[in-house]
Amino acid sequence: MITGDGKTLLDSSVICEYLDCLHDGPPLYPPAGDVRWQALRWQVLGDGILDASVLRRVEDKFREEHLHSADWIARQKKTIERALSALEGEVSVIGQSPLTIGHISVGCALGYLDLRFSQDDWRAGHPALAAWYADFAQRRSMATTVPKD
C-alpha cells in the first residue's frame, strides 16, 4: 500500500494497523492492557490458520503430484487444528469482546477454510467456534467481502 505521503507499507498486519490509525471510531488494535494482547493473540491464531492453509493449498494445487509431501500436508493440517482448538476454547470470550483485528483475522481464516477446504468440515470438531462464525459472517463487512473462487 502507498500512503498519501508516498510511503510504502507492506504486510497486511501493518496496513491494517495503519488504516486503524486513520479513523476516530473504536480501535481495531486496542492500545494497551489485556484486551490488546487478547486481540493480537487471536490475530496470530487467525493468521496462522491462513498461513498453514495457503501452504497446504500451494502443495495441493501447484506442485506436481509426484512431488506432494503427505508429511508436509499433515503438518499444515495439525497447525490448523491446534489453532482451531485454541479458538474453540476461547470462543465465549471472543463472542463477548468488542470487535478487534483478532475477530477479523479469525473470521477471514474460517472463511478461507470454507472456500478452499470445505471437505474437511472444520465445524464438526469446533461447534462453538462454528456458531460464533455463523453470526460473525453475517456482518455487512464480512458478507460483502466473501471471496469468490
Predicted regions and their residues:
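GST-like domain detector, emphasizing the conserved glutathione-binding G-site
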Residues: M1-A70
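Conserved residues at the C-terminal ends of beta-strands
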Residues: G4, G107, K148
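GST-like fold's C-terminal all-alpha helical module
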Residues: G46-A131
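Non-transmembrane alpha-helical segments in soluble domains
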Residues: C16, D20, L40-Q43, L84, ...
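C-terminal end-helix/capping segment
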Residues: A124-T145
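Long amphipathic alpha-helical segments
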Residues: V93, T145-D149
